[in-house]
């Protein structure tokens, strides 16, 4: 159930499940993940052009000057951004809080925004399980405490607690709510 030019926007703190949920939306429902651009180092099992477009900070700065981004931000010392070329029909995008604020401020009914929340303990465990060092995990948690303070989270269409859910359950809930929203829009 799709309308043209719709988008799912997923955000949340580090290791809240947003990237894995986006992958599940692709494999199970055919929602293509918009590939964002970043300057952060590639993790084990990540592939350039599949998970992110990995570029140098210099190239990212050039892309900003060339006005190639819908939104971009500096997060944990690395740049992240959504290029205009990656925004298309029926895509999902995983973004940080500033990107979420940018999309939320558009007030476009076709952009369905989600915030995934999970406890710090679970997120810390997930970070270690995916190969982050303890020091990096601690730094990310500390940074997230500042960034994701409750007053900083913009209005979103839906908040999902991903704490005790599998990635498939989170993706199913995102898809169900997305379809519900699209149905309401098409009936209005």
Where in this protein do the model-derived segments appear?
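ATP-dependent small-molecule kinase phosphotransfer cores
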Residues: 38-91, 95-98
